[in-house]
Amino acid sequence: MSYAAAFLAVASRHGERITLERNGEVLGTGLALLRPIYDRRGQFRPTDLGLERREQVLCMAQADLPLEPAPGRTLIRCKEGVYRVVNVRRVTAGLELVYWRAILEREVEGL
């Protein structure tokens, strides 16, 4: 069993189905583990009405998804809502892509 297959087995048991979009075009669907990031600094940003909390999530998505960094607005849709991809990195074991690690930020509805 490869590392990617082992990750996919964990994601199929504990993860959820997501849809990956870039610039309004659906690129694929797959499984991912999504976990909130609570202890990260900088989750509050100033607005005209005071401080606003940015909800950030750690996403570990299956290797089959085309999540590589690219120009444009990349979104992940899941049952909890819509998230914008802030940062994405490959997690590899040797030359094998095991999964994608991404930091997501919740999108505000209507923007």
Where are the regions a protein language model picked out?
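Active-site-proximal polar cores
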Residues: M1-V26
